UniProtKB/Swiss-Prot annotation:
Belongs to the KdsB family. This is 3-deoxy-manno-octulosonate cytidylyltransferase. Its EC number is 2.7.7.38. The gene is kdsB. CDD domains: CMP-KDO-Synthetase (cd02517). It comes from Helicobacter pylori (strain J99 / ATCC 700824).
Amino acid sequence: MIIIPARLKSSRFENKMLEDIFGLPMVVRCAKNANLVDECVVACDDESIMKACQKFHIKAVLTSKHHNSGTERCLEAAQILGLKNDERVLNLQGDEPFLEKKVILALLEATQNAPFMATCAKVIDEEQAKSPNLVKVVLDSQNNALYFSRSLIPFLRDFDAKRQTPLLGHIGIYGFHNKEILEELCALKPCVLEDTEKLEQLRALYYQKKILVKIVQSESMGIDTKEDLQNALKIFSPNLLKR
């Protein structure tokens, strides 16, 4: 099951879930991509998102406005839907309208092999890595996440040296091996790191839970600001959304 948590009052770009992406609301575009891989449900926090989904025949459920993270919203949706404890759950973002089908499939495969949860990352350049809106991740020898940050990591102390490892940009999608793991993560107390960086995945690392990271090739970009949307619409065309 794929669940897309959709919050109307985003702090950086209010109402972005309903922004038009080549004739479809952003969240609907995301859901149509997800439906190419598995059954998808949008976990809404507002009737306006529900109505937009229903208009385009996208399955949706109404959840609380008071969740601290998209993961918590996914759990409520899973409970409303009555998912079985052993069912895998993918958490895709409602602000990734250009995410390729192959990336979702890669996440699904990684989730099957991950003991706890999985996510994806892609190689980025130095200039991209400077943006705090693009989260960076560093990995251990088994491709498990060591840390996620809005800062540039790993930091290259010797400026004239050549990087030995690529810079990795996190793609904010998650796969949980089963519903019970989703429940386990949400039951953990929030930690100071996730609050400092505003990155919910740091809760798992703080409590020593493994996050397997699948490195993928992707041209997708998350839409965090109005400027992101304007730039994306210049880069992408409707034909590219058929990938």
